[in-house]
Design a protein with these regions (language model features):
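Short amphipathic alpha-helix used as the core "switch/output" element in two-component signaling
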Residues: 42, 64-76
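Receiver (REC) domain active-site loop signature in two-component systems and cognate sites
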Residues: 58
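CheY-like receiver
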Residues: 123-167
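Active-site residues of response regulator receiver
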Residues: 11, 55, 83
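Short hydrophobic/Thr-rich beta-strand motif most characteristic of the beta2 strand and flanking loop
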Residues: 28-35, 43
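Acidic catalytic/metal-coordinating carboxylates
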Residues: 5, 35-39, 61-65
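C-terminal output helix
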Residues: 107-120
Length: 167
């Protein structure tokens, strides 16, 4: 990988948090560790992450609430639940809230790495599908437009993009 995938790792167990972050950094991930749900939400509001690893059972804001907020505020963020207190019910709830994957601790590092790569690939696919759909919606009116209308629309689109880039 050329550039590093940026991960937010949320766990209240200090030793586990340090260990998993160190292992992921050795595998060329950029890792930001936080030890509470509140810190996770705050960090995600300040930085752009591609993936979040979230523990479920934490004091204060629990992992399900973190998942709910992260998916609402950052729809492109893939969230993987990594918990030592898992159950079928919590896995179902997490999936319904938008979790990409649900893992139980202890977790094999190679399996976690595979899930991280798949989550990153899914994120890219979703963004491309979204951008393709957005472009189709922008260009659809041009299909039936006269040549002069097409030219005006393309000019407006070009000016709009230039304005967005200059901000």
């Amino acid at each position: 990988m050329g550039s590093k995938i940026k991960l937010l790792v949320v766990d209240d167990e200090k030793q586990f948090l340090e260990t998993i972050c160190r292992r992921l950094e050795l595998r060329n991930f950029e890792v930001v560790p936080v030890s509470s749900g509140e810190e996770a939400v705050e960090a995600a509001r300040k930085q752009d992450f591609e993936i979040a690893l979230v523990d479920l059972k934490m004091p204060g804001m629990g992992g399900e609430k973190v998942l709910e907020i992260l998916k609402k505020e950052h729809p492109w963020l893939e969230v993987i639940i990594l918990t030592g207190h898992g159950s079928i019910d919590s896995a179902v709830r997490s999936t319904k809230l938008g979790a990409y994957y649900y893992l139980q601790k202890p977790c094999d590092l190679e399996h976690l790495l595979q899930v991280l790569i798949e989550a990153y690939q899914e994120r890219i696919k979703r963004k491309y599908r979204y951008n393709d759909e957005k472009m189709k919606n922008i260009l659809a009116p041009l299909v039936s437009a006269s040549p002069l209308e097409k030219l005006r629309s393309l000019k407006q689109l070009d000016e709009k993009k230039k304005a967005e880039l200059s901000i």
